[in-house]
Amino acid sequence: MLRAIAEERGRLSLRREVCGLGCFKDDRIVFWTWMFSTYFMEKWAPRQDDMLFYVRRKLAYSGSESGADGRKAAEPEVEVEVYRRDSKKLPGLGDPDIDWEESVCLNLILQKLDYMVTCAVCTRADGGDIHIHKKKSQQVFASPSKHPMDSKGEESKISYPNIFFMIDSFEEVFSDMTVGEGEMVCVELVASDKTNTFQGVIFQGSIRYEALKKVYDNRVSVAARMAQKMSFGFYKYSNMEFVRMKGPQGKGHAEMAVSRVSTGDTSPCGTEEDSSPASPMHERVTSFSTPPTPERNNRPAFFSPSLKRKVPRNRIAEMKKSHSANDSEEFFREDDGGADLHNATNLRSRSLSGTGRSLVGSWLKLNRADGNFLLYAHLTYVTLPLHRILTDILEVRQKPILMT
């Protein structure tokens, strides 16, 4: 099936060069309706889902008058319709409002492929290689709809052409994912066919602790922190914030649920450190001795010097529910120069040393410049445009790194 789609896309490019778009329109409709019928409607199709997805395109007109008939230029209105395979209301194979090519591609992505997402806590060595200290893989499922991750039970909304890979139980799945100073969180989403004959990376991204902490500090209001301290702990603040991690070259994004690791105080900037062996601060010790350094602008690299990535934007933009913290440059680029960053092991020693428990001590630590602490980093979802997934599956097929 994948080979047939790739060959048809190649023929389409050739036809455009020879005689334009309209020359073989009927042939293309025949091909895509045949593909839809053969691979999704036939009952013998292996491991076939019971649902069928149709992409319907209608011409909608704007209310402003600009044309001869008082209507603005037509714009396509896209709807995703879902039917059971044995439904008597299935659109006919000759329905002109159905985009048969996109319907085939959508059903391919939703039904014919498996997806595995891996989240890892890593550091970068002097040579540019990534060292994985902890990772967790989880199977996810593609969906043309989405729902807010910060409020359970809300109704899903159609997100097509953006495809979402959501982890509803993200707090349980990534419960032990903590990141500290000098470390970064890396995310990789891999697609494979049902027989596992091929694998291809469709998303890679990373975000440094420093970027996560900066966003976290900005989002947690000073008023909430002070209210917690002045009320001697009676005011409970929910300190989970949602941070977006952009993909390379702006290809999709992932969302992280970020919260502070408990240190014995429920405030967002609590000062009561817990030195119990059960504390998450004792869960692991990083194995590197040299701190990472700022990225080099001349040659991107992620394990392999042959990888090429556009240098992304480095701006941080405010979001209402999600905050975009980076463009995932750390996952693909080498480091260079001398950074004024402390060794990651210092975080553990500082966190376990303990400070005063009084209100005065809280006030001093609130205003302390060097206030690093461990953060939970829970992956909530990855989202990508459908056409970018298709390109990676049919043409690029980049080999996975975190899963190896």
UniProtKB/Swiss-Prot annotation:
The modification Phosphothreonine is found at T290, T293. Disulfide bonds: none annotated. Pfam families: DUF2045. InterPro entries: DUF2045 (IPR019141). Residues 261-307, 320-340 are annotated as: Disordered. Keywords: Phosphoprotein. Residues 320-336 have a biased composition (Basic and acidic residues). The modification Phosphoserine is found at S267, S276, S279, S304, S306, S324, S358, S362. Coiled coil: none annotated. This is Uncharacterized protein KIAA0930.
